[in-house]
Amino acid sequence: MSNPTMILSTTLLAISCAISGCGSDSNSVTAPTVESDGDLSSHVVATKVFTNGEVYTVNPEQPWAQAVALKGNKIIFVGNNQGVKAYLGKSTHIIDLKGKMMMPGFHDVHMHPLESASAATQFTIPAYASEGEYIDAIYTASVQNPDAQWLIGYGHEITSLLEMERAPLSVINEAVADRPVIIMEQTSHSMWVNGKALQLSGINVNSQDPIGGVYGRDVSGKLDGILYDNAGNQVMELAMKSLPNAQQQDHSGLIEYTMPELNKAGITSISDARTYWQRGHLETWQQVEKDDKLTLRVSLGLWAYPGMNDERQISTLKSLYQNDPQSLLKVNQVKFYMDGILVNTTAAMHEPYDTNWLDLYQNKGLNYFTQSRLEKYIKALEATGFDFNIHGIGDRGIHEALNAIERASKGNARHRITHLEVVNSEDYTRFEKLNVIADAQVAGEFTDPNHWPDTIPLIGSERAQGLVPIKNLLSAGATLTLSSDWNVSTFNPFVGLSNAISRVPQNITLAQAIEAYTINSAYAMRQEQVVGSIEVGKLADLVVLDRNLFEQNASEIKNTKVEMTLLDGEVVYQR
């Protein structure tokens, strides 16, 4: 799409060059002839200047520009090619964008970077396979990892287990019986375990379900090998303790894989949405910072353990708070789960599920944290400075989270509710009223309207309409952020942008989607004053793209490539 401001700026520049004789290339910017930078002592001399670009600033006062000048890590000029000449000196590095698009670096305020790239996972199994294929895959993993105390895997979908002819416990026991095995399902909301894992965890047929979790059982009441939600999390905690050098492997994974890949996608700021501080995750991030290896701005969301004593947990969380404004790493968020997920029939709903995987009477899902407990944490931790990232998928879970914030918050926090799959229409306006950020993920295919019918057997046709209602929430005044929940969905922001504008009837404009990935997410991370848009005085977290997103259709946006990513004015990725 042509931009009138850009056309006008280019035209004026061409006229200016014609008058001043600045060369045949009307868009060229040449440093003035001076003996040294000292000759420009009355001016600020830029260290980097970007010219001839289509710069989308996400600043409503100046949406588009041609040129950007940096002094160290700060933006000192945003405007046209002619205006930026005043900031040039002999040492200025001039980068000709050649018409490419520049925009603020992307934020992803909900992802799981440590878990997604962790070396803790020793093997992967298919999402769907026959019982025999699963047995072969798990047995092969045991042969390939002879010294592992626990076999830790990943990859199946829950329905692949629920549709087995035999109990999943019988199948996995046939593969490996002498060592504990735990396999995380793709959403991380259930685990498939063998008998040895149950034994070492102290789980038997008489065990009571833990807070926020369910031990899967067959029709006779026997354990079936599926641990739903927090029931699985507790066993995974035990499995992780068996790993030697886990922190060092996670440290290497962040530096060598995760951060480079995120920078390659144009991402400059993230929130770790589940920092397991009892697994060493916090220390891993802190070591990366200490080693001066961070290439992202990072806010950690400390995991709130649902089974832990509240007073002990609150005291510990307060002690871990870290919010140095000069640091790239901040520990200023807490991650709470209100409920589970729809496909497990554990998302908290007002009305019972039509299909009940858990065989619980009048199953309406479960709570990791009740409304009253969440209120307690809000009252205790807001004063410290924590913002809450609250997992809410079912209409009851979301409603209770809003209730807790309304009853307990002092109003200065920036709490957000994430996922937002089934939202009651009467709760739409409460997001703006309570200053609650609406965080959604649309990069995954399962949130696409074409897949809404998949949930009809679980919650009926009426509740299955309008899942993840980003358009309705925006229309009701909510501050919307878009994120990935990687590795549940791809972290590629261009997939998210493409889906956001094409998921009719809950689609939004490209400008709104970009705001959700930039300035709105910066607001959620309490850094909108320094990043999230391209403005004078802000820090230079920037990304250069191979195309103007506003001139592409939805499918073309998905194919966008990042040419360059800058954090704090320094190039952290270049194609």
Residue ranges of model-derived segments:
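C-terminal motif of bacterial Sec signal peptides marking the signal peptidase cleavage site
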Residues: A18-G21
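Bacterial signal peptide processing site
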Residues: G23-S26
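Bacterial N-terminal signal peptides that target proteins for export
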Residues: M1-S9
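Divalent metal-binding segments
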Residues: G38-T51, P60-T316, N332, F336-G397, ...
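His/Asp/Glu-enriched, well-ordered alpha-helical/loop segment
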Residues: G253, I378-H415, L420, S425, ...
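Acidic (Asp/Glu)-rich catalytic clusters
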Residues: V288-D292, K318-L329, K410, F431-K433
